[in-house]
């Protein structure tokens, strides 16, 4: 793809010396200045209808969707409800679907500092990768569409015409402080450009993934072994249990301040935390987990739909109390999550030799039937459902991204081929409407249908379940494509937090954190709410080591931001989070204000804790394939192969029990199913020591 490149600076031409090569431009100030600016422009032909623009975690198809003015949390108006609706989002940085427009963002708004453009008719892609900052100020990135021309400007420092804060745009020049330079100071804007043949949007994501893995890396770190986190988490989870109603609440008793803190199906943890608790926990944890599944069945409508919220004997709907019983709204995603995890738990319990109550099995089947019924009526699942009637209130989206996986598990457990048929048909719909078009929406309940990572994270899981169910290679290929797209939400480098911020002082390394959405512009600890198991499965099926590396990055990040007695995470009030608790905020952007970059720890978000529990459950702390020379340490340990032995080193202050999985090509042919924890070896590695075990395959 052809492009023009230009360079410029503020002040007179004689004030700056400019030298460049293919990969960077160096500006040297020849004068003192209190308000210096430097930029590199790329201009290319990119007609709106023939282009796809992606900025990782920031813009998908340029965010060219309908915007509606809503305060947080935004909800659909009655006039916007319906089965076939356009994608809508609150005001945020975007290009317009038609006509000239611009969007100004900073490198703090991106999981990877990069802009990707696909010219569909030409089958050509343009990529420019760049650096985060100069003189401790983030670079700015402008996209400006004028007719068929697209201008991409990389600017040091950022200077936004409109600044984004929590579902609103405003003029705030003070949000972008000026850059002061002295004579002789150097400012570097990197710009690694690639123009490549590219047949499709899915191919664009593959090319991005490959470049991302080569160009960006994080530094190693270790502070809290997975096993130590698990000990703290299981203990704290007992404070979540409500004896009189028999369920694990979303929040602990000392932090239960609203209805949202009691029971929410799926999504942020209801009926999900119970999976690691029943498999890895004590007999008490297992019993209480089964009780919780029975409780979930009691919060199910006659039509089979799980109510979104339950507190103190009362049902609440997923509409922020706008409509109540008029529409009886429940999030499709909540219901689908809980169904998926219920079947995983049913299979796990039976694999461990425990009897599953018939009430739980019937509840799971009713939940699966409800999704089949809505599919048979509408040919889609929608985003919001009337829990009493099963009618779609708001359609479209990828909110049902995990539905094919849930129905695959239902089909495997019950033998009902109807579930398998709907799972496959639904997978085809997800592929056609989300993966192929490069945009997933509808995962969270409070961002309308802005693009998000949560719906993206569900698709590789569903496609892999379809592949394991019927063996059709197309589903493996689609799982790879969905995993490439998901990688755009995962931070690929160690963002430089300002040294005076909480995370700057703590030395938090951002690689592997996962962005929430283009509306809620923060990265977060892990995928909401699922382990990165899809990436392990993809490595086992494809031998692409890049899948292992991104799995490791996601898993490895989470314990960094967990609170524990020896290093509590302090909240905004100065009060420490209880041991094991985690706040979802990994603020790279200033969406909550410049003072909240690397901060704004308001309290426990719960779901990251459950994601870490799932990661301990699902992901081997050390994975090795000796015949290929592969060792991947996701846990907070070092590991290597030498002389037919696997060495594991623990540099943390805590003794570790490390789950180890050693495989060869033959072992990797095994399907993991819903329960694979019996495949792990557990290796004790005392603090400060190195142990070794045989790397031979059992």
What are these regions (language model features)?
Residues 2-10, 181, 185, 198-263, ...:
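Low-complexity, Ser/Thr/Pro/Gly-enriched N-terminal "stalk/linker" regions
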Residues 17-24, 28-183:
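Beta-strand/loop-rich accessory regions of lumenal/periplasmic or secreted enzymes
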Residues 178-200, 686-696:
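Short Pro-Gly-centered flexible turn/kink motifs
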Residues 222-223, 278-293, 345-365, 408-424, ...:
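Structural helix-adjacent loops and short alpha-helical linkers that scaffold large soluble proteins
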Residues 261-280, 289, 326-348, 391-412, ...:
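Well-ordered alpha-helical segments within folded domains of soluble proteins
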Residues 286-337, 359-375, 379-383, 426-431, ...:
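Helix-terminus loop motifs that line ligand-binding clefts
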Residues 428-443, 470, 474-601, 619-638, ...:
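Non-catalytic carbohydrate-binding regions of carbohydrate-active enzymes
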Residues 637-698:
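C-terminal beta-sandwich/jelly-roll accessory domains of carbohydrate-active enzymes
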